[in-house]
Design a protein with these regions (language model features):
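P-loop NTP-binding module
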Residues: 1-165
Length: 165
């Protein structure tokens, strides 16, 4: 018989119970589900203008850091100017790896809405994959569809939603 520790379902923290330092079960599931796909750069794309995209990305990044440690970086590309997109793309895709850079590193990139900041389009297109960020009850279906069309629906691994405030 195995000596492995057994965990009963009732011993696990509930989804809505605050368990200090541990992200929600749904975020953990999202993180591990996107790990099944191959990517080294993943961009979070707000589906509409003026969205608090960091409210979506920071908790997901926290889960990723717990799982991957220093092998995950967060790149804040909000308000990036078109003249700065090329160096940013080089940084996020790892085209220029300096001495001491690690293999297996992944980058989570945050951009502003491509509807209000077109300079985010080349960044989104350069990433291996994307996640669509949607605020429930606030994001318009038209804006979400337009965002999918601009970036390319096939690039998206899924969608992160925030409930109504």
């Amino acid at each position: 018989m195995s000596r492995a520790t057994k965990l009963k379902v009732e011993d696990a923290p509930a989804e809505d119970t605050a368990w200090a330092g541990i992200p929600s079960l749904s975020l953990q599931q999202l993180w591990f589900s996107i790990q099944r796909r191959e990517w080294s750069s993943l961009v979070a794309v707000p589906a509409d203008r003026d969205m608090p995209v960091m409210d979506f990305v920071k908790p997901l990044y926290d889960v990723g850091r717990l799982a991957m440690g220093d092998n995950l970086r967060l790149v804040d590309a909000r308000e990036v100017k078109l003249t700065r997109t090329a160096p940013l793309i080089v940084e996020m895709t790892g085209a220029v790896r300096g001495p001491g850079s690690k293999g297996g590193e992944r980058v989570l990139v945050v951009i502003d809405s491509v509807l209000s900041h077109p300079s985010g389009v080349p960044v989104a297109l350069a990433a291996d994959a994307a996640l669509l960020c949607v605020e429930m009850g606030k994001t318009s279906l038209t804006a979400a569809r337009e965002t999918l069309q601009i970036v390319g629906a096939q690039r998206f691994l899924g969608c992160i939603t925030l409930p109504r405030p």
